[in-house]
Structures are given as C-alpha cells and as structure tokens.
Amino acid sequence: MDMAQYQPGQRWISDSEAELGLGTILAQDGRLLTVLYPATGDTRQYALRNAPLTRVRFAPGDEVTHFEGWKMTVREVEESEGLLVYHGLTAQNEQRTLPETQLSNFIQFRLASDRLFAGQIDPLPWFSLRYHTLERRSQLLQSSLWGLGGARAQPIAHQLHIAREVADRMAPRVLLADEVGLGKTIEAGLIIHRQLLSGRAGRVLILVPENLQHQWLVEMRRRFNLQVALFDKERFAESDASNPFEDTQLALVALEWLKEDERAQDALFAAGWDLLVVDEAHHLVWHQDQVSAEYALVEQLAEIIPGVLLLTATPEQLGQDSHFARLRLLDPNRFHDLEAFRRESEQYRPVAEAVQELLDHGSLSAGARKAIHGFLGSEGDELLASVEGGDEEARSRLVRELLDRHGTGRVLFRNTRAAVQGFPQRELHAYPLPMPSQYEELPAGEHPDLYPEVNFQQQWEDGDDNNRWWRFDPRVEWLIDTLKMLKQFKVLVICAHAETALDLEDALRLRSGISATVFHEGMSILERDRAAAYFADEEFGAQVLICSEIGSEGRNFQFAHHLVLFDLPAHPDLLEQRIGRLDRIGQRHTIQLHVPHLENSAQQRLFQWYHQALNAFLNTCPTGNALQHEFGPRLLPLLDGGEDKAWDALLAEGRARREALEAELHSGRDRLLELNSGGAGEGEALVEAIEEQDDDFALPIYMERLFDAYGIHSEDHSENALILKPSEKMLDAGFPLGDDEGVTITYDRAQALAREDMQFLTWEHPMVQGGMDLVLSGSMGNTSVALIKNKALKPGTVLLELLFVSEAVAPRALQLGRWLPPQALRCLLDANGNDLAGRVSLETLNDQLESVPRVSANKFVQAQRDVLAKQFDVAEGKIVPRHEERVARAKQQFAAAMDEELARLTALKAVNPSVRDSELDSLRTQREEGLALLDKASLRLEAIRILVAG
C-alpha cells in the first residue's frame, strides 16, 4: 500500500480482528497509523508499512447502510481527495448520496466468499476447527463460571460466591475482611480476573505493603496467569514514557515508595484506572481529627477510580472506629458519621437472630417475627406464612431478602473459620534442647538467642566447616534425626533468615545425605518454581524444603503436613503465616508442628508465650496482633531474662486477656454478615459446576485439534502431563505457547496444585484463549472443498455447507455476550435448496469426507461461481429468521434481567443506603445502550464448505 493513500476519514477493516467492525483512519504519524473502530470504541495503532488492513470499497450493486440505519443500493462510486462517495437508490427509489465517513460502523463483509472466489481454499480440518472454536467461544461467554474456573486453586464455595457477587457489579466498591487463611488474595484475584475477562475493568492498580509485593506478583502470575508490572523507584525513574503507568494494564505498587514520591503520585492519578485494590488496608491510619499520609493517598485514589477492593483484617480485630474508616473510603457519602454508623449497626442484631432461626428450621420467636415484619413489611408476612405452610423455597427467599437488606452486606464480606468448614486439626510437638556453650558466651544484645546462629554466620569467613554453627547447634542434630524418622513424608522447614536456610541445606547434605532443596528471597521466581517442583515431585523429589521467612510468602505446600519451625518469628501474625503454608482448606491431614527450642533462652520463653498465652500453635489467633501491641513493651525485656515469677505472671495475664478478647469476638459475631459472605449455598453450586467442568474431556480434545492445526508437537511427560514444543511445521510464530523451547502442561487441577512448574490449562488460560483468537481472527478454515463418499448421493451431487455468525458488536463491558454470544448458525443446502443441517451433523459429514487438491478445487469453484453466489443468498434467507429469533429472545432476556436488577436495587435503596445512585444510573445507561446495540446485531458469512459427491 502506498503510504500516501491512507487518508483521515477512510474506512478500512482489520484482517485480524474483523469483529471490530468498520475502522476509520484517524491519523498517519511518521511510521504509525491510528485507526478508530467506533462500533466497539477501540483504537489500534499499526506499523505503516505492514498494517493488517483491507480498504472498504463497495461496488455498484452492493447494498450499503448509513450510520442512521437507512440503506441504499450503490449505482456509482466517485473518489474525492482519497475519500469515496457512494451514489445510489433507496428501497423507495429515492436518490441518495452517502460519503464513506457516514457508513454504518456495524457493516460486516463476506470475506469467506471473497477468499473462495480468489482461489484461497484451506485444508479440510481447519473448517471443523473454526466451527468448534465458534461453538466453544459461544458457550464460554454464556457460562456462569467464566473467570471463576480457571484459577490454579482449589474451588472453595465462599471464595467463588464472593468473587461472582462482586465481579458481576459495575465498578464494585467492597471490603474483603475474611479471617486469616480463608484466601482474601485469591478472592481478589478471582474478582480482578473475572472483571478483566468480562470487560468490566480494563486497567487495575494494586497497592500493597512493600513486603507483600513479591507474594502478589507470584499469586497473580501463578494462579491467574495475570502479567502484573511491578513498579518501584528504579523502574519509574528509568522509564522513557511521559507517564510510565499508562503502558501497563495491571500495575503493582508499594505504598511505602508511593507516599514519598510526589511525581509518581501525580503520574498515578493521571493514568486512569478502572479498579483499585489495596491489601492490608487496616494499616491505613484514620482518626476523626487526623489521617495518615497513606490513608490520604488511598482516599484521593478512591475518589477518582470507579471500582475499589480493600483487603483488610476482620472488623472485630480492627475495632469499630477503624472499621468505619475503611467503609468511609468506599462510600464517603454513605459513611460520613461515626456515631450514626454505631447506632445503625445495633439495629441489625435482631435481623441476624431471625435469619439464624430460619436456618435452624425451628419455630420462630416473637422477636424474629417482629424483626422480619419491620424489615420486609407485608412481603415478609406473606413469605412467613408460606414458610409456616412448609414451603422451603419461601424460607430460602426470605433469608435472601433479609441478607440483601443488611446494612453493610453489599459492601462488606467477611468469612470466619467458625463459619467455613474444611480446615485441618493441628498437633504440637515441642523439643526443648540444651543450650550449647558457644551460644552462652555470646555478648548480650537484642534477643541474642532468638537467632543466635546469625552471630556465627557473620564471623565465619575462613571456610573451615568445623567452625560453622551447625556443627554444634543441637537443633541441627535433632533435625537430622527427625527427618530420618519421617523419611516417608514430605517436610517443610521454615526459619527466619535466608542465610540460615542455605546453611541448613549444607548441613543436611554434608552430615546426613538427606535430599533437601532451599527457598529464599534471593532466588528468582523461576528458581523458586524449580525448587517447589523438586519438593512436590513424589517419586524423585526432595524430602525436605527449607524456606526463609520471606521466601515462602504466597506459596502453598498443602501436599505436606509436617512443618518444622526451626526458630520462631517475633510476631504472632508471622507465625500464623508460617503455619498457613500447610493449614489451608483442602488439607486432608492433621498438621504436625515440630518446634525445637533452646532451654533457658529467649526461644523457650517465646515458645511459651505463643503456646500458653496466645494458644497460637493449636488454633488461629485473631487476637494476636492486639495482644502483641498491648503486651509487647513488657514482653520483649522478659524474653532475654528476668525473674521466673514475673514471667509466669505475664503468661497468666496474657492468657486471661486472650480469653476475654475471644469471648468478646464471639459474642460480637455478625451472623448475618457471615451468612451473606458465605453465599447461603450458592458457592457450593459453583464448586460442583467447576468440578464437573474439570472432569469434562472437551478441552483436551479441542486442544489436540488446535495443536495439530498449528504444528505444535505434544508428547507425554508423566501421568496427566504433556510436553508441548514447536515443530518444524509450526504454522504461526504468534501461537501463544509461552516459551519457544516448549512448556509442560496439565489439565488436572490436583496435579497443577502440586506442580507449579506446569502450566494449568483451562478454557481461561492465555494459551487456550490466544489459540482460539488466532483461529477466529485469521481466515484459515473459512473456505474448504471436499469429496463426500456416500452411496446415497449421485456422483457429482453438490452440497453447500455454510456457517453464519450471528452476533452483536459491542463494548465488552456491556457483556451482551451473555444474552447474544457470537454463535455459528449452520446451513447445509442440497441442490433443491433444502436445509439438511438439522438432520446431518457436522461430525457425521466429517467421517465421510476426503480432501481435494487445491488446483482441482479452485477449477470447480470458478466453474460454479454464479450458481454458488445465488446459493449463498438462498442460505442466508434460511438463516435470517433464526438470527432474528435469537436477537428478539436476547433483547427480551436482556431487558428482563436489567429490569429485575433495577427493581431489586431500587427497592433495596429504600431500606439499605449502601446502594449508590451511580449504580442505578449505570444500570439504566447499560440497559439503553445494550438494547440499541442488540437492534444492530448482524449476521455474517463466516465459512463455506463445498461438498462434491464422488
């Protein structure tokens, strides 16, 4: 293409993304061409020399459509300054003129027929691949699991319920406040993933404490295949872009750096985001008369970013003032007065009790009846009468109605271990060991015997192994003996420092020959993956994985159930994080905790504090942070020494305070909130659906067809795993294999959870979606000619098989694909114009077909060109009623769904101020735009297969 021929206003169509509709040239700038696709609102930039575009040029006899909807038949085409002007007649015989700039953005093209008559005929298997890809894409867009089933995680009911409930809102603003170990990060990842897939969000900003950056990076990449850009001072400074944040879809930023860098803050505010995610939001300090810099920064971002997810500790841990501060970030108009919030919170207690009575299936108390009537009025009375008549559906509906009207039920989700089943038990094994003389001689310092080996690591420089700390530390001898005793089990060892982990690996190798691998923050993600895979391998893997404190963040080793705490962390939350590597939902064994510690040392006293005062080994300790804050100033001096009497008194006081706090937490449990957060059975249905999808063989069968078509070689790796490599015949270098050298994949969820070095292929995986995009965005498979061997057909009989796609071109955020997904409508015409598609399936035909050489196929097509062109019109006439029926049904269902949701939220707003006006306005706009775009739904000829009886 002569570069001078690109003119602003010209209409072009993308060769690789035909679904975008007509494009308009916006600008030609240097070596770049900018094209706007008004139908979807997308803008693309192409290299000028090889832009994958085709000029839209209609010929006399073609029908064209104006953007206002009227049509005309072209009689004459003229060109003026590079732009086309069409002259023609409308159906009413009016003469009209239509400049190409005013063409409808939704016009579709018969690219398949153009290719067929140009002699571009494809190999036979490609037609079937295109059909199956269209069918599967249509099913996926309608699936309630879309964005939920593809995570590398065990499907867990409460997580799936929260993810669907939140991700299906436009611009959700919610607080995720589950107890530790219930998977807030996974919930956030599921929400991000589903919002991105559905188009409800396009750009996401994740703010985290600096020490959690790596954990988030690993979680998002490993579990959700989300490529997150980690921003820090160096990356920001080195970027040549005017605004470095604008170049990424998902940005991960540390709050500590951001609050100190005003230039980065300005860039972040200007970048434009759809969703803000803030982890550890309870550390944002707010008081009525003063706020921290971090809180003020998040508050500014929350004012300009439509969607906000705050991940935080439970409301009971925070205290009501701090909890109110989080809610205030989500909706400052709704949560503006702390005292009013306190009063409102008290009003919901009777409703929670009524819901509990309904779920207990007993007779309802007078108080419960009063609460139900007070909240639901006559509607509640009617449902109550049905419940007492034995109507279980009415009972479920009554529970749902009460949950919906709960004060913060739409903005706050909080699950507790008490409410969620599936956690393992814990057993503690303590091993007091004698203090070696080398440690006793250490100079006094800050907790010298919590991590006494550190002093010797700093001193050891002469390379003499005999002087190394692990030669005399009794914990090492104990560890070797314990590992030998547990040789048939996988054992996870965690210590505070990376240097200690490396030393322990040396000690095990040199002193015992025990197979161990190490895991610490100095390793790259790839190195950690390999270490984790080596540990997970049942047959040839390491028995032991030795982790540093930071190195194991975000990892899941629940296939093991023996945990050695080689030392103890200085904070109970870190202790819970360590145990949480194994203590997760889905762990099938009792967790065995092995804790060696040196007698008469800070180690022993810290062990006693965690066990006797906090009970932190045998149970989770939601009060740990509060107790540490309260007792820390007295605890730390006593760790290093001090009288036994004072120490025993502190243990007793700590235990009493913990028990009092736990009783307070239990009495303050918001049962209504727990029920709403758990989903009251909806999450279990999602789990069952995902398990059913996992057991389906449709994906492996489809992917084998895809691999064969693109020249991807697959071979067995092990049970449930394959190795994929590009072959010499690889068709497209753009196939999203992920690694030019090859990758190992599995379709098995359990295998993927144990082996993080393997790609977990689901319908949502980038390789699968990218492969489907390649098929549908390219033209391969939209023309085919074959010989059909069927004795019932006379030789020379011609059957014409056509695939039409019925679709609405619309921005993804409207999610019209749920009601009118692009669907292949198949037509099989015989010589008499009868449609046989309902009687003869595509698979039945495939079994009877043989390939035809391209030269012969092309000769036949050219000879039959006029006949075929007429049959295309006959086929379209057969398909149009089916298309119109689909569109009418989609409009009806879409309008009904929107009206139902609008009615629900409008009624809810009257009793629950958590419903924002912006939500209702957004839904009304969505309804209008959606119906208008469904009216413009189009039918296009996607693929042609000519079958000649032989």
UniProtKB/Swiss-Prot annotation:
UniProt motif DEAH box: location: 279-282
Domain Helicase C-terminal, first and last residues per copy: 475-629
Biological processes per GO annotation: positive regulation of transcription by RNA polymerase II
Disulfide bonds listed in the record: none
Keyword Nucleotide-binding in annotation: yes
Top EC group: hydrolase
Chain sites annotated for binding ATP: 178-185
Domain Helicase ATP-binding: 165-333
SUPFAM superfamilies per record: P-loop containing nucleoside triphosphate hydrolases
Domain of life of the native organism: Bacteria
Molecular function in Gene Ontology: ATP binding; chromatin binding; DNA binding; helicase activity; hydrolase activity, acting on acid anhydrides; nucleosome array spacer activity
Record-listed E.C. numbers: 3.6.4.-
Keyword entries, A-Z: Activator, ATP-binding, DNA-binding, Helicase, Hydrolase, Nucleotide-binding, Transcription, Transcription regulation
InterPro entries listed in its UniProt record: Helicase_ATP-bd, Helicase_C-like, Helicase_RapA, P-loop_NTPase, RapA_C, SNF2-like_sf, SNF2/RAD54-like_C, SNF2_N
HAMAP family for the chain: Helicase_RapA
Protein's job: Transcription regulator that activates transcription by stimulating RNA polymerase (RNAP) recycling in case of stress conditions such as supercoiled DNA or high salt concentrations. Probably acts by releasing the RNAP, when it is trapped or immobilized on tightly supercoiled DNA. Does not activate transcription on linear DNA. Probably not involved in DNA repair.
NCBIfam families: PRK04914.1
Family to which this protein belongs: Belongs to the SNF2/RAD54 helicase family. RapA subfamily.
Subunit structure: Interacts with the RNAP. Has a higher affinity for the core RNAP than for the holoenzyme. Its ATPase activity is stimulated by binding to RNAP.
Name used for this protein in its record: RNA polymerase-associated protein RapA
